[in-house]
Amino acid sequence: MALRIFIWIVMILSAVGSVVLLALGNPLWKWGAAIIALCFGVAGVGKALYLKLDTLRGRFHLILSIGALIFCAAIVVGMVSTTPWQIFGLHYLARFIFIVSVALMFVGLMKQGYTLSARDWVVALLLFAALTAIGLWFFYTLYAGATTLMSILVYMSLFIMLEVLAVVQVYLGSSLGVRWTAGALSVMCVTVGDMSMAYFAVSSLPIWETVQYLSWSVLGFIMGVICLLWD
């Protein structure tokens, strides 16, 4: 309980402090995204241990938290390094772990007897297609010179969205369905952040850097809150 309260306090202070520093024009505001991602990772480990590692949800949160901690490292490296393979390598690894965690969760649910009807699949695929079409239109319209490195990152984020939408359909109507819907929103945030990183790289417009780190902060905050809800 004490750890959860501490994480709550750190996340809230980091979010508020980051916004205040941004308003003051202090570049240190970007570190808020890294701190919140760290809180997300630590909260995920705590929830995994609470749920027990021999349960499906426990294993899911453990793998998810590892991805969160690597995502935190990717944000930090992105602020202190300009070496592409270091930055993208960590971002790719974090996204890959996110993909694996959700995939294992989905497969585990299927093994436990949960099923998706043809209608559920159609709904998930239609939502995914609509969101992907909108996202890629904005991505390639604003970032006409999309590099392979950035394109891969965006596609990985979109694939996570497809997985999450499928799990949302499984849990729809339950309290976990609400949380997975919030998780889908957080995946949209990370995708927006990834796209904004590309826009900033090619345009150097400060607005895109702001959107990038704010989007990643929202991702970390939403997922951190979900991981702090123990049940």
State the predicted function of each range.
Residues 1-231:
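Polytopic alpha-helical membrane-helix bundles and their juxtamembrane interface segments
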